[in-house]
Regions:
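Conserved active-site-proximal phosphate/metal-binding subdomains
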Residues: 62, 72-110, 116-220
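Active-site entrance/lid segments in N-terminal catalytic domains of soluble metabolic enzymes
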Residues: 1-105
Length: 220
């Protein structure tokens, strides 16, 4: 019954098909839904690929687009080399290119990744963004349902504690340094079964399940 699905950690190429099948099941029960589809992209190239594929195969387009830049937390849609090469100014050019496409198609576009202050929001508004996505800013609030231990890790983190890790998903990710990451770097494995959540993950070789790790983190 959700109103929209925001999908990232890879290109959601078959998202329209998955949602359409779910809507058909609901329709058979007399429930009519029109779920909005919102892909997360990091480059104009990724957006072009999604738009072209969705239009050709499903005759549909995104209802909104979220752009996540190289300063975002969690999974990042960049290679390690790209993370090193992008500057705020050079990534602004990427954002402008994405915005030119979304404006052309009259699709709202929201920018995220390193958005923390009013000045950040005003900067992206000046570029033409319709809104901003903010997550880290609100993790430590009372309204966030994460554990206090999880929130405390954010509060106590210093700049040097923020590290880039290689996720089992196959993408780089930004995380807070902790004992768990030290153990992974030392070669320990924490696989206790596979949830089959991501096709690019090989449970025989990855050191841990990303879904389990995220759940354990938020639960403290």
């Amino acid at each position: 019954g959700v109103d929209c699905i925001v999908s990232g950690a890879g290109l959601p190429m078959n998202l329209p098909e998955i949602v359409h099948k779910a809507e058909e099941v609901l329709a058979a029960s007399g429930i009519r839904r029109a779920t909005k589809l919102v892909p997360i992209v990091s480059t104009r190239k990724a957006l072009d690929v999604i738009i072209k594929y969705w239009k050709k195969k499903y005759d549909t387009t995104p209802d909104m687009v979220v752009v996540e830049g190289p300063q975002a937390g969690g999974h990042l849609g960049f290679t390690p080399e790209e993370l090193d090469s992008y500057t705020p100014a050079s990534y602004d050019e990427e954002i402008k290119s994405i915005l030119s496409k979304t404006k052309e198609m009259q699709i709202p576009c929201v920018v995220g990744g390193g958005v923390y202050t009013r000045q950040d929001w005003e900067h992206y508004a000046d570029l033409g963004a319709d809104g901003v996505q903010m997550a880290t800013r609100f993790v430590t609030t009372e309204e966030c349902d994460a554990s206090m231990a999880y929130k405390q890790a954010y509060i106590q983190a210093k700049k040097e504690d923020i590290v880039i890790v290689k996720s089992p998903v196959g993408m780089p990710g930004r995380a807070i340094h902790n004992v768990f990451l030290d153990k992974v770097r030392q070669g320990e494995r924490f696989m206790r079964g596979c949830r089959q959540c991501i096709t690019t993950c090989n449970p025989a070789t990855v050191p841990y399940c990303i879904t389990e790790a995220l759940i354990n983190a938020v639960e403290g």
